Amino acid sequence: MALQSAPKLLYSSPSPSVFSANERRVAFSDFVGLSKKRSRRRRIAGTFRNFPALSAVSSAIKAVVDVDRAHHSTDSGSPTVSTSSHPLDQQVVNLEDILAERGACGVGFIANLDNKGSFQIVKDALTALGCMEHRGGCGSDNDSGDGSGVMTAIPWDLFNDWGKDQGIGPFDRSHTGVGMVFLPKDDLLAEEAKKVVLDTFAQEGIEVIGWRSVPTNVSVVGRNAKETMPNIQQVFVRIIKEDSTDDIERELYICRKLIERAASSHTWASELYFCSLSNQTIIYKGMLRSEVLGMFYYDLQNERYTSPFAIYHRRYSTNTSPRWPLAQPMRFLGHNGEINTIQGNLNWMRSREPSIQSPVWRGRENEIRPYGNPKASDSANLDSAAELLIRSGRTPEEALMILVPEAYKNHPTLMIKYPEAVDFYDYYKGQMETWDGPALLLFSDGKTVGACLDRNGLRPARYWRTVDNVVYVASEVGVLPMDESKVTMKGRLGPGMMISVDLSSGQVYENTEVKKRVASSNPYGKWVKENLRSLKAVNFLSRALLENDTILRNQQAFGYSSEDVQMVIESMASQGKEPTFCMGDDIPLAVMSQKPHMLYDYFKQRFAQVTNPAIDPLREGLVMSLEVNIGKRGNILEVGPENASQVILPSPVLNEGELEALVNDPLLKAQMLPIFFDIRKGVEGTLEKRLNRLCEAADEAVRNGSQMLVLSDRSEELEPTRPAIPILLAVGAVHQHLIQNGLRMYTSIVVDTAQCFSTHQFACLIGYGASAICPYLALETCRQWRLSNKTVNLMRTGKIPTVTIEQAQKNFCKAVKSGLLKILSKMGISLLSSYCGAQIFEIYGLGKDVVDIAFQGSVSKMGGLTLDELARETLSFWVKAFSEDTAKRLENFGFIQFRPGGEYHVNNPEMSKLLHKAVRNKSESAYAVYQQHLANRPVSVLRDLLEFKSDRAPISVGKVEPATSIVERFCTGGMSLGAISRETHEAIAIAMNRLGGKSNSGEGGEDPIRWRPLTDVVDGYSSTLPHLKGLQNGDTATSAIKQVASGRFGVTPTFLVNADQIEIKIAQGAKPGEGGQLPGKKVSAYIARLRNSKPGVPLISPPPHHDIYSIEDLAQLIYDLHQINPKEKVSVKLVAEAGIGTVASGVAKGNADIIQVSGHDGGTGASPISSIKHAGGPWELGLSETHQTLISNGLRERVILRVDGGLKCGVDVMMAAAMGADEYGFGSLAMIATGCVMARICHTNNCPVGVASQREELRARFPGVPGDLVNFFLYVAEEVRGILAQLGFEKLDDIIGRTDILKPRDISLMKTQHLDLSYILASAGLPTMSSTAIRKQEVHTNGPVLDDQILSDPEIIDAIENEKIVNKTVKIFNVDRAVCGRIAGVIAKKYGDTGFAGQLNLTFEGSAGQSFAVFLTPGMNIRLVGESNDYVGKGMAGGELIVTPAENPGFRPEDATIVGNTCLYGATGGQIFVRGKAGERFAVRNSLAEAVVEGTGDHCCEYMTGGCVVILGKVGRNVAAGMTGGLAYILDEDDTLIPKVNKEIVKIQRVTAPVGQMQLKNLIEAHVEKTGSSKGASILKDWDKYLPLFWQLVPPSEEDTPEASAMFEQMTSEGASLQSA
C-alpha cells in the first residue's frame, strides 16, 4: 500500500493560504533517535471509507498519523505454560512476574447491525487502529511495536478460496474450527510443536484438515520484534461429535488446554501459543506498530477477507523486549487499562479450582486447569477468567458483570429503577472478587460484540452509530472520517457502563438494558433475601475488662510501645482519624534496627504510580466499599440459592460482641484456633513446627465443615513460656496452606488479636488473607484511656474533645476504616474484597523460609530473618512482660519521635547542630566533624552496609573535576511554597542558582518577581525581596525546576515557559499514592494569589493527576509540556517500590527527559503516620532496579536518572552514582542547612524558626541566608572529589553505574546476618553514552506539529508580534494533539499570562486530538467545529474556547458527547462554551474559568476553587466533591440532582440572588450567541419557567458573595444607609 501524499491544510482566511502540500508529511527524522529508515516505513494500513466529500480528509489522516511519536516499546519474554501435572502444583503467583508486564492501550470495535460481512469493516478497523498509534509504544529500536491486532469473524470466503486450491475446501462452517498459532521460530521445533497439536486433536477425535502458513511481509517488522517473531500458521480442524456452536467452542477450548499441558514438558513450550482457536472468531496480532499490522498480514489486504465486526487494539507496554503473545486482542477481550488486584485474583482463581464444576464439562474440569498464568499479563489472565465463564455457558456480558462489576451500592438510579441488577451484584459479590483497576474492555464471542468500563470510569470510551446501521466504539473520536449528517447517535461509556451489539438480531443494548437482561435470568433477589445474612451492629463495651497491671503486661507482651498507645491508639480514640506527622521516616529499616519490631514493620505498602491512578477515598467514596462476606464461596460456574448463604459485614473491623455473634452463627460453624507456641524445649524449630500444626488444625476444621476459622491470641492469663505466634505469620501460613490444599474457598479467616492497632497492621492482615479482625487489646486500651484520671481531667478542662467510653472505641474503629480506605485507594483499589489476599506489599528483611511458609509470591529482594530469628524477636517482647524488673510503664522505642535512648534517627539534633556550625561559619573542620558523625552513626540505611573498593591507585585531588562541575548535578526537593515559608523557599532557590544547580518550586506556582535578577542589593538586602538577607546583585530566586502536581496550583502558561525543567510529581516518598491539602490557615493572601484562589480557603490536591490514569496518559502530559515549552526538559518523579523499573521503562518511552527515583525516607510537611512509616521503599533498591531495567531495555541513554531521599553527604552521592544516578536531590538537608532545627512540627504551622510556617511572627525568625546552602553543597562536592581521588577516578562520569566499586561491609548486626545485597550490586552493563553526554542531550521533541505550521504563517507571526487581529480556519484530526499549546507558549513568553492585546481567532474543523486548546492565554479565541477527545482546555489561563458539532448533524447536539473527560483541568481563566455533553470530571480543579456545557458525567466541578460552571443538562454522580471555591449552576428538569451532589462542602440552593441570576443568564446568552445552542435558546425564551429549575452549588467561601447571597444587596444598601446617616 503506497503512502498517500498529504493535502494542503484546508484554510479559509482573508488572505491566501501559505501552507504547502508537503507541510504535513510524516517527518520523523527530526525526532530523537529516529532513523531515515524508520521515517520511510511509517505508514498506515488500510484505506478509509469512500466518502467522496471527505477524500481529502482521509488522505490527510493517513499523512499525519502519529507524527509526534518519539517514544516506543515492546515486551519481553514469552508466556510460560504451566508445567504442572496437577493445577494445584502450578507456579506460585509471584508479584515480580506480574510487575514485569504492565501497560495501556488504544482500542475500539466496529459492528454492522445487519450482520453483513464486508471488507470495509476490516479496512476501517485498520484505519482506526492507525489513527491511535500515539496510544501505543515501541521498543528501543523505535520500530518494534508493543503490539497491535484485530479480532474478526472467521473470513470463510478467503479460507475457502485457499482450501479449494489445496483440495480441502470449501469448509463446513458449522463444524470447522480455525486456530491462529504462533509456533517456535526454529523449523525443527515447530514441527515438534505441530506434532503435539496433531496428537492432541487426534486423541480428542478431531480431524486436522490442514495447516496454512499465514502469508506475511517480514520486511515491515522492527528489528527487536523480528528476533523473536514466531512461525505463524493456521490450523483447520473438523469437529463432528458436537453440533451446537457452544459445544464446539467448548471442545476446542479443551483441546487448547490439553495442547498447552502436553507442550509444557518441552523446552519450546513458551514458544507455542494459540492466538485463537474457534469456530466463530480469529485474531491477527503481533509485536507490530498499528499502521504496520495490515502490511504485515497480507490476508488483511485481501478483499475476500470479510467480517461483520472487528475489534482492534494497540498496546503500550511498560516493558520492551518483544513478546508476541501479549499483543491484543486476547481470545475474548481487548483491554485498555491495568488490573491492580491481579495477584489476589490469581490466588483466588487458583483456590477455586477444586470447587469448579459444571455439567457442560461432562466431568472434564481437571483438563481445563489452571485458569490463570502468573507469567502472563493481567490482561491475559482477565481474559482467561472471562473465557472460563463464557465457555461454561455465561454470556460475555454476564461474565464481565461478574468480574468487573460497577459501583452499584451508591447508585440511586440503579437501586430504584433496576433492583434486579443490584440483587445480581449482591449475589456475586460473595462469589467472585472484583478484578479491580482501570479497564475499558472490548469483548466478542462472535455472536455479540460489546464494551464495558470499570467502576471508576478511568479510561476513555466514546461510541457512535450511523444511518447505515454500523456501531463504533473507540478510545478516541476522529479515528475514522464521518459525515456528521449520517451519525444518528453519539455517546460515551461512563463508569461501570456497558454497550452490547447482538449480531444475530441487530439490536444495540445500552447499559441498563444489558444489566436488566442479564440480571433477570435468575431469581437473585429471592436467593439473596432468603440466604444472605447481615451482621447486626453490637454495642461497644461500656467498661474495662482488665486491671491496669494486666493490660500493661498484655501490651508489653504483644509489642506495644508508649508511642503506639499515645500517638496512635489514644489519638484515634479521641479524634476519630489517623494521626498525622511530618519530616519523613528517618529511622533504620526494621531489619537493620537494634530494637525489636513487630512483624508488620517488615512490610511496605505498594501504591499506584503512572500505570494506574490512586483514588480519593474522601471525595470519591461512592466507588469504594469495606464490605466483607464471611462464609463458604460456592461453585462460580453454577448458580443457586446456597451460594448466597453468607454473612455480610459492613467493614472488617469487629468489636468483641460482633465477633461473638459471628462465632454463634450456626451456619458458619466457626472454629477457634489458638496461636500460642511452647518454648519450654527451646526456640530452634519450635515456631515452624507450631505453624505446621496450626495449618493442619485449620485443614481439619475446614474438612469438617467450618466456614469460619478464628485465629486467636486471646487468653485468660498469658503464660511466660507460651508466646503468641505473630498473628500476621499465622494468617499468612493458614491462608497459603488452604490455597495449596484446595480448601481456601470453603472458609473465611477471622482474627481475634491483641497484635493489631494501626491501619497498616489491619491492611497487612487483610492483604494476606484475613476477612475480619477483632482488635480486642486495642479496644481495651481505648476503654482504659477514657477511664483514666488524666483523660477525664483533659476533657474537663476542654483540652481534648469529650467522648464517652463507647464513642472512644467507635472513634478508633472509624479511624481504622478511613485509614484502610486510604491504603486501598493509594493502590487504586476500590473494594476491600479485592484487597483481601491480594498481597499488595513488598517485604524488606524476611528470609526465604518465612516468605515461603506464609507470604509466597510477595517480593522480598534482600532476604533477612529466618523463622528462628523471628521467633527470638517475638520472644523479646514476651520476655520483657514477664521479667522481674518489668517496667511500670510502656517503653518508648522512639520509632516516631526522636528521644535520647530511643531508636536512632538520622536527622537528629546533634547532626543538625554540626551542620549549622559548618555552613554558618564556613568551616571545613566543622564539616569534617559532621562527616565523621555520619560515618560513625549506627547502620541506618541499605547503603550503610556497603563500602567502596577500587583496583586503581589513588590520584591527586587536583586531577579530579572541579566542585563547580559537580554541584551542577545537585538539586533540591520539591517543597511547596505554602508547606514552607517564602523566606525558606526563596533562599534555597537563590543558593542553587548561585551554584548552577537546580531548586524545585514544589506545588503552588511562583511569583514572577522571582524570575528577574536582583539589581538593588545594598549590604545584603534588597527592596525586591526585603524579607531576605545575605543577598548579592545578580541573584535570582527563580526555581529552575517548576513542578506540575495533581492540584495544578499556580500552573499557568507563563509559569511553564519560564521553567528550565518541569517536574511531573507522580508520587512523594513520604506519602506515595496520596494527595495533599493545604489548610486554610496556611493560605495567606500571598499564597492565594499565586495559587489563583481565595485566602483562608483549603486547597486540595487530588491523589492522582486526573489526566494520568495510564502510561499513555503520562506520555500525553509530557507531550503537552514539550508543546508549550519545547526547550524545557520534563522530569517524572517516582517513588521506589517493586516494579519501578518496569514503570520507568514506560516513562522513558513516554518521552520523559529525566526520571527521578525517590526513597521512602524523604521528608513531608504533613502525612498520616502509617504512610510515613509503611509506604515506599529504599531508593537504593528503586534506583538499582530502574537503572538495570533501562539498561536491559536499551533505554538508559534516553533519560537522566535523578535520585533523592535522605541524602546527607558526598558518600551518599558517590553511592547513588555507582548505582546509576546522574543527578542527586537533597530535601530535608537543604532545609536544615538553611535553618531548620528539626522540631518536627511542620504540620502544625508553628515552626519555631519560620522554616515551615506561614505565620508572619514566626517567619521573622528565619535564620538562613543563601550562602549557608551554597557552603553545604560545595563541601559535599569537595567530599565527592576526595573520594573520587581515593578511588583513582577523575570525574563522576567514570563511576556512574559502576556497582563493581561497591562491596558489602564486613559488619555483623543482630538482624542483618542473612541479608543479601546482590540485587543492588548486580550490573546489567553501562550506558553507551557518558552521564555528561546524557545530561547535555537536547530536549526530546514532539516532532512536526500543527502549531508549528500555524506559527509559520506570516499573518499569525505579525498578529503575535504586533498585537493584531487575525482569523484563520484549519482542518484538524485526532492525531493533532495539544493543539494551541505551542502558540500559547510563544504568547506567554512574550507577554505573560495577561499582557497580549491582540486576537488570534482560530477555527478548527474536524475531530481534535487530546489536550485541544491546552494552556490558552488571553487573546486566543478558539472555535472547534466538530468534536474533541479528553483534556479540552486543560490549564487555560484566558481566551475563549467554543466547541460545537458540525453543521446539520444527524443527532441532537444536547444529547451527544462532543468533548471528552477531564476538561478544563486546572484552568486559571478564560471561558469555554460547549454545545453538547462532556465526559467525567468536567472542570476538575478549575480555578477561575467560566464554562457552559449541556451535560456532564460523574465528578463534575471536583476540587474547584474558583470560577463559574453552568450545566444545561443532566450530570453524573458526585458533583462538587472537594469544591472549596467558585459557583456551579445546574439545570434540574427532572428533579434528580440532589442525590448526585456531594454535600460534604457545598450548599445546594435555588438561584435567588439577583446578581447570581444575572450571572447565570449572561453566561447562557453568551453560550447561545457563540454556539447557536437550541437548548440554551429554549431556556432563554422561557426564562421564568426555567430559572426556578436551576440549582446553585455554593461552597462556604462563596456564601457571602453577591452571586450567592440574596441578602447581600440588602446588607450592602443598609450599610450604605448607615454610613450616610
UniProtKB/Swiss-Prot annotation:
[3Fe-4S] cluster binds at residues 1236, 1242, 1247. Its main location: plastid. Inhibited by N-bromosuccinimide, which is specific for modification of tryptophan residues probably involved in the electron transfer from ferredoxin. InterPro entries: Aldolase_TIM, ET-N_metabolism_enzyme, GATase_2_dom, Glu_synth_asu_C, Glu_synth_asu_C_sf, Glu_synth_centr_N, Glu_synthdom, Ntn_hydrolases_N. GO terms for biological process: ammonia assimilation cycle; glutamate biosynthetic process; L-glutamate biosynthetic process. GO terms for molecular function: 3 iron, 4 sulfur cluster binding; enzyme binding; glutamate synthase (ferredoxin) activity; glutamate synthase activity; metal ion binding. Residues 105-504 form the Glutamine amidotransferase type-2 domain. Pfam families: GATase_2 (PF00310), Glu_syn_central (PF04898), Glu_synthase (PF01645), GXGXG (PF01493). It catalyses: 2 oxidized [2Fe-2S]-[ferredoxin] + 2 L-glutamate = L-glutamine + 2 reduced [2Fe-2S]-[ferredoxin] + 2-oxoglutarate + 2 H(+). Signal peptide: none annotated. Pathway: Amino-acid biosynthesis; L-glutamate biosynthesis via GLT pathway; L-glutamate from 2-oxoglutarate and L-glutamine (ferredoxin route): step 1/1; Energy metabolism; nitrogen metabolism. The keyword Plastid applies. It is found in: Plastid, Chloroplast stroma. PROSITE patterns: GATASE_TYPE_2. Its EC number is 1.4.7.1. FMN binds at residues 1183-1240. Binds 1 [3Fe-4S] cluster. The active site is at 105 (nucleophile). Its cofactor is [3Fe-4S] cluster; FMN. Interacts with ferredoxin. Interacts (via FMN-binding domain) with SQD1. Catalyzes the reductive conversion of 2-oxoglutarate plus glutamine to two molecules of glutamate, using reduced ferredoxin as the electron donor. Contains one FMN but no FAD. The FMN-binding domain is also involved in the delivery of sulfite to the reaction center of SQD1. This is Ferredoxin-dependent glutamate synthase, chloroplastic. It comes from Spinacia oleracea (Spinach).
